[in-house]
């Protein structure tokens, strides 16, 4: 994604509770802020320190002397590469909440190598430094904001370190990348199983509003739409496997990309091109799962 280094817009929807703010980095990612009586929670720090600083500038008028907390939904670059702004020596040092596995990812040699590769390929990542969460979550964490309760829940599948936030007073789910329009990316075969379980768990909360980091939707129907998509991925993979298909089968012959988009009410002219690779990965994960027995 190519975007200005500090382009973050505060997005408002008329029916969205004013205590929840959407911070949009053009078409790359949405972060969110929850304004409680006791603190403000920033959900994700985007893909660069410059974007995190721009998000902080959007938030500053809303802090009103309340402490700021930060939460990483997971350690992917577009959700955690701005953490430096909130670390010791950064512009606004504060606690960063994340899953224990996210901390391990952000301190790993593999993640350092991925960042170095990004920095060689794109100057926008030059100022990124890997900063791990400082408050670690294993399964769940409750943040009591006074007027709002923020229930941090483990939500694996897209990645193993993924967290989502449920706000019961608003019947609102901050889904991160666990739900996505048109559909999320499962992290391999184990991730596919995990994501199906996570979506089922999140749908059982019966939210009125679902905010995801990609797709720009607020509709609670996103969860059932994602579940219907994965059910069809499973059905198509099963039919192909029964007919002799192998994990390396041509995905278009198993479940065509346009057919998948039509199922969720869109087409390739209205979604980013990378969703094709998401879909191919999801179908291959289902085929591998069947091959493994």
Name each region found by the language model:
Residues 5-12, 131-153:
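Short, conserved active-site entrance elements at the starts or edges of catalytic domains
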Residues 9-61, 164-177:
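Conserved beta-strand hairpin/beta-sheet module of binuclear metal-dependent hydrolase folds
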Residues 25-26, 135-136, 156-159:
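A short catalytic or substrate-binding loop motif that flags glycine-/basic-rich loops and adjacent residues
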Residues 39-40, 47-49, 142, 149-151, ...:
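Metallo-beta-lactamase
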Residues 57-136, 142:
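Active-site HxH/HxHxD metal-binding segment of metal-dependent hydrolases
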Residues 215, 226-257:
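A post-motif C-terminal structural segment
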Residues 243-293:
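C-terminal regulatory/interaction regions
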